[in-house]
Amino acid sequence: MSGAGVAAGTRPPSSPTPGSRRRRQRPSVGVQSLRPQSPQLRQSDPQKRNLDLEKSLQFLQQQHSEMLAKLHEEIEHLKRENKDLRYKLIMNQTSQKKDGPSGNHLSRASAPLGARWVCINGVWVEPGGPSPARLKEGSSRTHRPGGKHGRLAGGSADTVRSPADSLSTSSFQSVKSISNSGKARPQPGSFNKQDSKADVPQKADLEEEPLLHNSKLDKVPGVQGQARKEKAEASNAGAACMGNSQHQGRQMGAAAHPPMILPLPLRKPTTLRQCEVLIRELWNTNLLQTQELQHLKSLLEGSQRPQAVPEEASFPRDQEATHFPKVSTKSLSKKCLLLSPPVAERAILPALKQTPKNNFAERQKRLQAMQKRRLHRSVL
């Protein structure tokens, strides 16, 4: 009974223990189940990040490639437009050259698309607009006291300057459009500096050209009277253009902008007659120079010949005056006489001739002798 009671007494405390053990084991199982899952989550986080980064990189690469393709398309389009503009400029230049200075000023419709402002006499003007000379003269006419005389003077000045202004605008358009086709638009200050630097050599050339042509015409005797008249007219026109440009610079009164003077070929196109005259002048000057050179050569040769003749004549006198005395051979010793025998007793030997045949034969003989010596030594 006691054993049963003990057993019965022992059962109730044992009953709560397994329940408590079970309750304690449940959270432990959950903790155990969570512990192995934590490294899996840690491993999944960098994988997701890598995937996200790869996706973002692919997206950026696609955007970059699309932008590059668009930029290349724009570059090709701009190149085509540039070619078209150059073609139009060339065609406009050819049409302007065909028209010449006889036509009116350049209209805005005929001006090229890439034309820019042009600096003429220190003033920026549109290529198709009125010239600065006309603007200044229009303002000066209102202030002139003499009514009809002033208008006539202004009209004559306009007639003289209109071809020069039209040619200057066309030439500056062609030069600047070609040079600045692939560049940005420069500032007007840089143009002013370049114009002020280029004015000095242009002025010197313009002042020297008429003087040189006049001097050549005076010197050359074979030039015809018509050529002289045409050249004189061209020089007078150049002088008149110079005077008009200086008068314009004084009227402007702007010391910061020096007057700009164009060379004669740009103001007035050369004709075939003028080219022929220049060629004749150059040919005649060449002939004169060759004649002068020949004359100078003859003078130099004539001045050198009389000096050479007395020198040649003086040589025999010196030879006659400088005769060496004969030395007697009696006082000399016999040994010296034996060492220097007379020319007749000397034996003249023939010159040695070395031919390839002789050399080959000598080599063969030497080889045979060497072989005989070796055989003799080997036998002994």
Curated annotation (Swiss-Prot):
Keyword ATP-binding: no
Superkingdom, taxonomy of origin: Eukaryota
Pfam hit, one: CCDC74_C
Keyword Coiled coil applies: yes
UniProt-annotated stretches for the region Disordered: 1-51, 89-108, 128-202
Keywords: Coiled coil
Coiled coil: 47-93
Protein name in UniProt: Coiled-coil domain-containing protein 74B
Organism this protein belongs to: Homo sapiens (Human)
